[in-house]
Amino acid sequence: KTTTTTTLLLLLALTFNAWGQTKEMSINPEESSIHWLAKKVTGQHDGTIKITSGSLTMQNDLISGGNFEVDMTSIFVSDLNGEYKQKLEGHLKSDDFFSVDKFPKANLLIKETRQKMPNHYEINADLTIKGITNPVSFEMHIEDNVAMSKLIIDRSKFDVRYGSNSFFENLGDKTIYDDFEIDVTLKF
C-alpha cells in the first residue's frame, strides 16, 4: 500500500509539473510608460498617459495572459506648452474625445498569445475605452523584466468622433486621423 501511495503521489507531482508553473508578474507603474502619437492632416501631437496597474500571467515562462489599467485622467501633451498645452489636454479629456469624467479608466485584457520566436509574442486582447470593448492585436517583446509593444488603435471604434472622417464629411485640413499609436514599456 505504501508503494502504491508513493507511486500515485509521484505521478501526481509529475503531472502538475508537466502542466507547468503559473506566475503573475506585476508591473511597476512608476517605471512603466505609455507614449501616444495622434496625427492630423496638418501635423501631429504626442504625449504620455499613466498606467496605474497591471500584470502578465506566465505559464512555463511564456506569456499566457494579462490585464492592465490606464488612468485616462492623466493624459499629458508633450509637444505643446502653456495655454495651448492646457487647451489640448482639456479637449482630449472632454466628451469630444475620451470623456474622462465619465470613463476615468481604460483597460486591456490579454485573451490569446502566440510565441513567434523567443521573447516575441503575437497578442490578441480586448481593449476597453469609454466603456466600449473591441479586440486589438499587437506584438510584444519581453526581456529582462521589460515588455515593449506598439499598438495602433482606431479611435472611431470607441466612439471618439471629433474631427473624424468616419463620422463627418468635408472636414478638409481639420481632419484628425482615426488611428493613433501608443508605445508601451512595462517594467516588472
Question: Which stretches of residues belong to each language-model region?
Answer:
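Low-complexity, acidic/polar, glycine-enriched regions of mature
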Residues: G20-F188
